[in-house]
């Protein structure tokens, strides 16, 4: 009886610890569930294993019928375990106001679908293929597509651009998933066995097929990498290594390190939107330098 009680209390204490960590890490963040004055278009992009996966799209004001627009696709973070499309809704609303089509992608995660990171990558790539296949009706300029995300979502963004494999068996692989730019927010990019590798054991022996940093080759798209120097999950050395590998193949990579900031600092918080504003302006300037938007940031 004593052992059963001890086991019960150990499990309860672990539950409380997990809940405390979730509140500590995520409780201060303030995700938006709507964008005032903006209509959202919800589409099913994939049905797999009885799971229906959707994406949400926002369009520029005064949308012109036959015009194609630069597009940015956001993948939320959550360690491939959870998360919500609300994470990047504020950024999506802002860049729609700057004249882009913006997309929030849902994908399979462990807590809801019992999936692995490999299924998450497959979904991320399926979403890009769907957008390219339906580019005309969705006003998407396929030559000006940006993938973006935070943490595990940033891993998915880098994956669609860099990984040649990890495709859904039902996908039309004649449609490539390459994008023309990446915006990575404290992103997982290294799944290798070294000190900077994230959850290497979880990836297994096939880690090279899913680790973006190990698949950087000539032609890798221009990238902005945003990171805090107090991030407890992604060391600054990983961003430096990513940039070094990008430099080696002749691709542009801007790394922005924010002093004293931890994981997820770029989101709006209950008490401040300072770093949301700062990082969004930097992304705006990066996209402007690529010719995707015009003028100075408007926030």
PLM regions with names:
Residues 115-136, 278-282:
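Alpha/beta-hydrolase active-site loop
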Residues 225-227, 231:
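Short beta-strand/loop motif that positions the catalytic acidic residue
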Residues 126-198, 207-208, 212:
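Primarily recognizes the serine-hydrolase "nucleophile elbow" in alpha/beta-hydrolase
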Residues 56, 240, 247-299:
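C-terminal catalytic histidine-bearing segment of alpha/beta-hydrolase fold enzymes
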Residues 85-104:
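Short amphipathic alpha-helix adjacent to the substrate-entry channel of hydrolases
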Residues 232-238:
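Conserved alpha/beta-hydrolase "acid-adjacent" motif
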Residues 29-67:
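N-terminal cap/lid segment of alpha/beta-hydrolase-fold proteins
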Residues 67-77:
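Short beta-strand element of the alpha/beta-hydrolase
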